[in-house]
Amino acid sequence: MGVFDPTLLILLALAALGIISQNMTVTLAILFLVAVRITPLNHYFPWVEKYGLSFGVLVLTIGVMAPIASGKISAGDVLSSFLHWKSLMAVAIGVAVSWLGGRGVVLMSNQPSVVAGLLVGTVMGVALFRGVPVGPLIAAGLLSLLIGKG
């Protein structure tokens, strides 16, 4: 890493976008990556790149499943989700989005040239529109439908 590090500048610009939009999730995530980049911890980037997404999905899944595990959502509530049309729609959409995410993983693996655009778009969506950073996989899945890959 030299005196002029364009990657660091991009990260700092994205962190500034997170600060301006008052999105602490984006800001903290990017500042964490900046800290890793400028310290000896940077040799962990291959590990973060390889396992970071899986770890993030694990944490997200824990957060989503916590109401069932805690009893806030009862077994009866889960079973009744197959009896109401809104819940059936939620199940169908969950299946569709999971399928799109799977296509997205394949596209991102096979065509790494699209990853930068997906990531920048996701960070912008999170920072500007209060989205959540699950966008790259779904965006890649949608892109795969448009370009016929995945």
From Swiss-Prot:
<feature type="transmembrane region" description="Helical">
    <location>
        <begin position="51"/>
        <end position="71"/>
    </location>
</feature>
<keyword id="KW-0812">Transmembrane</keyword>
<keyword id="KW-0472">Membrane</keyword>
<dbReference type="GO" id="GO:0005886">
    <property type="term" value="C:plasma membrane"/>
</dbReference>
<feature type="transmembrane region" description="Helical">
    <location>
        <begin position="127"/>
        <end position="147"/>
    </location>
</feature>
<keyword id="KW-1133">Transmembrane helix</keyword>
<dbReference type="InterPro" id="IPR007382">
    <property type="entry name" value="UPF0756_TM"/>
</dbReference>
<keyword id="KW-1003">Cell membrane</keyword>
<feature type="transmembrane region" description="Helical">
    <location>
        <begin position="10"/>
        <end position="32"/>
    </location>
</feature>
<protein>
    <recommendedName>
        <fullName>UPF0756 membrane protein Dd1591_2981</fullName>
    </recommendedName>
</protein>
<dbReference type="Pfam" id="PF04284">
    <property type="entry name" value="DUF441"/>
</dbReference>
<comment type="similarity">
    <text>Belongs to the UPF0756 family.</text>
</comment>
<feature type="transmembrane region" description="Helical">
    <location>
        <begin position="88"/>
        <end position="108"/>
    </location>
</feature>
